[in-house]
C-alpha cells in the first residue's frame, strides 16, 4: 500500500515527465510531439496518432488506481488518498468529457485551446468498461461495448480505428513509413480481445443481473466470432502461435511478428 500511495503522489506532484494532474484529478499526458500511450508510432519525429491530452484508457486506468487506493486505505484505516466524494466527482467529469451522443467515448479529450477533442472510434474506450472499478454506469458501458462490437470487432481481434473514419488504413504494407502510418490506423490487434472480453462479460453480467441464459448466449456469440483465429490462423503463419497484427479488412492477412506474446496473452485471457 505505501508503494501505491507513493506512486499516486508522484503523479499528482508532477514528478513524472510529461504528466501532470489537472484540477479534476485526471492526468494530462504528453505534448504534441510525444507519444506516451501504446499507440506510439512516430515518423520523422512526428506522432502518427497524436494522443496528448487526456487519452481515454489512461484516465480509466488512473481512476481505477485511485479507486483501488481508496479501497485499500479503508481496509487498512490509512489516510485516504482519494475519497468516495472525489471519485464520484471524477466519474461526473469523465462522462462530461468523453461520452458522445452515439454511446461511444472520445479517444482523447482536450480543451479547445489545446486543439480540441479527438472523437475517433478506437478500442481504447473499452478500458472504461473493462476495469474492476467502473468509471461508467453499466448502461453507458453497454453502449461502449456495442460500438466496439459493431465497428471494431473482427474474427482476429479488434481494429485500431473504425472503417468509417476517413483515416482508416487497413493494409500493413510498403516501406517502414507506410507501415507505420497504418500500424494503429485500422490494423487488427489480437491482444485487444482480452480487454473486449472483460468489458463484454462485465457489462452483460451487470445489465442482465447475471442471468445465466443471457451470459451463455453472449459467450457463445463471442467464441463463434473469433473461431477463425483458432480454426484457421494457428496453422497458417507460425504453427500454434498468434501473429502480432492482421489487416483491417478481409481476408485478414497476418502481419508483424509471427508469434507475439501479447497477442497470445490477450487471447488466452479472453478465453
Language-model regions, residue ranges each:
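Amphipathic, non-membrane alpha-helical segments in soluble helical-bundle scaffolds
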Residues: 1, 52-59, 80, 84, ...
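Aromatic-rich carbohydrate-recognition surfaces in CAZymes
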Residues: 1-41, 55-59, 63, 189-203, ...
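Catalytic cores of carbohydrate-active enzymes
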Residues: 9-12, 16-23, 28, 61-172, ...
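Acidic/His metal-coordination segments adjacent to aromatic residues that form catalytic metal sites
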Residues: 32-54, 111-113, 172-183, 244-254
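Substrate-binding groove/exosite segments of carbohydrate-active enzymes
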Residues: 54-57, 122-129, 178-191, 197, ...
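Acidic, serine/threonine/proline-rich low-complexity intrinsically disordered regions
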Residues: 74-81, 142, 199-220
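Short, contiguous acidic/charged loop-to-helix segments that flank catalytic cores in large enzymes
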Residues: 116, 179-188, 201-214, 254-259
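Generic long, charged, amphipathic alpha-helical segments
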Residues: 158-193
Amino acid at each position: 500500500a505505501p508503494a501505491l500511495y507513493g506512486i499516486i503522489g508522484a503523479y499528482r506532484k508532477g514528478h513524472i515527465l510529461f504528466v501532470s494532474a489537472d484540477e479534476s484529478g485526471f492526468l494530462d499526458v504528453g505534448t504534441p510531439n510525444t507519444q506516451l500511450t501504446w499507440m506510439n508510432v512516430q515518423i520523422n519525429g512526428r506522432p502518427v496518432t497524436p494522443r496528448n491530452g487526456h487519452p481515454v484508457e489512461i484516465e480509466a486506468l488512473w481512476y481505477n488506481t485511485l479507486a483501488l487506493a481508496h479501497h485499500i486505505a479503508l481496509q487498512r484505516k490509512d489516510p485516504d488518498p482519494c475519497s468516495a466524494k472525489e471519485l464520484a466527482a471524477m466519474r461526473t467529469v469523465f462522462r462530461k468529457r468523453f461520452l458522445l451522443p452515439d454511446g461511444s467515448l472520445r479517444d482523447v479529450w482536450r480543451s479547445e485551446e489545446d486543439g480540441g477533442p479527438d472523437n475517433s472510434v478506437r478500442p481504447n474506450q473499452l478500458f472504461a468498461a473493462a476495469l474492476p472499478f467502473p468509471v461508467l454506469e453499466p448502461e453507458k458501458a453497454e453502449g461502449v461495448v456495442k460500438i466496439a462490437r459493431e465497428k471494431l470487432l473482427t474474427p482476429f481481434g479488434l481494429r485500431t480505428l473504425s472503417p468509417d473514419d476517413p483515416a482508416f488504413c487497413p493494409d500493413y504494407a510498403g516501406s517502414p513509413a507506410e507501415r507505420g502510418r497504418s500500424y494503429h490506423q485500422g490494423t487488427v490487434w489480437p491482444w485487444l480481445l482480452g480487454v473486449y472480453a472483460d468489458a463484454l462479460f462485465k457489462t452483460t453480467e451487470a445489465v442482465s443481473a447475471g442471468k445465466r441464459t443471457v451470459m451463455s448466449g453472449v459467450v457463445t456469440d463471442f467464441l463463434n466470432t473469433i473461431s477463425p483465429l483458432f480454426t484457421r490462423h494457428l496453422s497458417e503463419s507460425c504453427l500454434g502461435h498468434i501473429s502480432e497484427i492482421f489487416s483491417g479488412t478481409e481476408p485478414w492477412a497476418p502481419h508483424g511478428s509471427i508469434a507475439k506474446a501479447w497477442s497470445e496473452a490477450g487471447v488466452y485471457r479472453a478465453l
